[in-house]
Amino acid sequence: MESKKKMLFIFNPFSGKAQIKSKLFEIIDVFVKGGYEVIVHPTQAVGDGFEKTKELAPQVDLVVCSGGDGTLDEVVSGLMEVDQRVPIGYIPAGSTNDPLPSDR
């Protein structure tokens, strides 16, 4: 039996207006149907996304995070800390959903 790819999904349950909670099943279902075994971690405090990413990134094939720019920063910083070249996905769910400045 072929082993499934593993994915870490880190999300901030309080980011923005906490609307991510109503979409969790749909998000996880998409990745499961895509062949991933999904490890789900809702952040509990500032810095939690960083620590969980450092802990689990060496064990997964993909990291996806959802939240605001702080959540994205923690996950990217965690990957950099352990020097893991794991693809990363981002589902914006912060109050402004604009992690990068624009010239518009």
Please name every model-derived segment:
Residues 2-104:
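Small-residue-rich beta-alpha loop regions that form the catalytic core of phosphotransfer
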